[in-house]
Amino acid sequence: MNNYLRKLVEGQHLTEEEMYKAGLLLLSENILESEIAAFLVLLKAKGETAEEIYGLVRALREKALPFSNHIQGAMDNCGTGGDGAQTFNISTTSAFVLAGAGVKVAKHGNRAVSSKTGSADLLEELGVNISSTPNEIDYLLEHVGIAFLFAPVMHPALRRIMKIRKELNVPTIFNLIGPLTNPVNLETQFVGIYKRDMLLPVAEVLQKLGRKQALVVNGSGFLDEASLQGENHVVLLKDNEIVEMSIDPEKYGFSRVKNEEIRGGNSKENAKITLEVLSGEKSVYRDTVLLNAGLALFANGKTETIEEGIKLAAHSIDSGKALTKLNLLIAASNEKLERVN
């Protein structure tokens, strides 16, 4: 590890292979917590490259719990977090809208690191069992159409690092790679990131991971979601080509809304917002979910255009299908799935 730390101190990039080996060291028991913290801080100060991100993703996926990966066509819409905006749980709420529209959603997530309420905190508050095993997740994807993959369960080697990340209380490379380490063999992906200069590198990693189609977004105000506040910077991966775009919410019929107006709170407050949105209540929260779910449906290939994606997202909510998916997940995730274990 000393060689890698020395390179980072000198501002040098690590190669993909060096980062892969460093990643295996980070996940081992043969390293001091102070070394892990130093590595994360130095890497953040230098700035992460696509090669470094992919190298660490390789290490994490290698050490993750094994999946059969017989489920075809799955999607994740997990974002990086780390934007400091304290918004409600946009991507987690949107996940049920996607599922209600017929997308198989393998939602990867964690507890809060730099926000008040992470996806795991919200789902637990709503009554979802967040500790499903790989076999149970396969079952849920096949029979319910949505499953939650709790990062500490999927990546047991990350437990030490999670503690250090919490103590550092700043975004690190683990924010960036969270959405990229889903152990399910995803076909498509919608990724919100908090760093605009990482749009292309993250898209390049998704390309290396073999995604059929993907959309990476950095929202107005550097949100890790699409925002109603103004122009959103987007990179589309389609047909193995990467294209930069911008998305203006007003073009799709939305009024501009400041990011401060979609702030969330603790898990109880955010659960209330999620239930209101999925129940069809009109609000700025709903509009934010419609924009994000609409973009994700376009990224999935479920619709040909973003406009159609937004309409399909609205139908998923207003038909009751999105809320039904939540209720089905609550029930099925809490069953004793002995038949699949």
Curated annotation (Swiss-Prot):
Q: Which InterPro entries match?
A: Anthranilate_Pribosyl_Tfrase (IPR005940), Glycosyl_Trfase_fam3 (IPR000312), Glycosyl_Trfase_fam3_N_dom (IPR017459), Glycosyl_Trfase_fam3_N_dom_sf (IPR036320), Nuc_phospho_transferase (IPR035902)
EC number in record: 2.4.2.18
Q: Which GO terms fall under biological process for this protein?
A: L-tryptophan biosynthetic process
Keyword annotations for this protein, in alphabetical order, are:
Amino-acid biosynthesis, Aromatic amino acid biosynthesis, Glycosyltransferase, Magnesium, Metal-binding, Transferase, Tryptophan biosynthesis
Q: Name one Pfam family in it.
A: Glycos_trans_3N
Cofactor(s) it depends on: Mg(2+)
Oligomeric state and partners?
Answer: Homodimer.
Question: In UniProt terms, what function does this protein have?
Answer: Catalyzes the transfer of the phosphoribosyl group of 5-phosphorylribose-1-pyrophosphate (PRPP) to anthranilate to yield N-(5'-phosphoribosyl)-anthranilate (PRA).
Please state what the protein is called: Anthranilate phosphoribosyltransferase
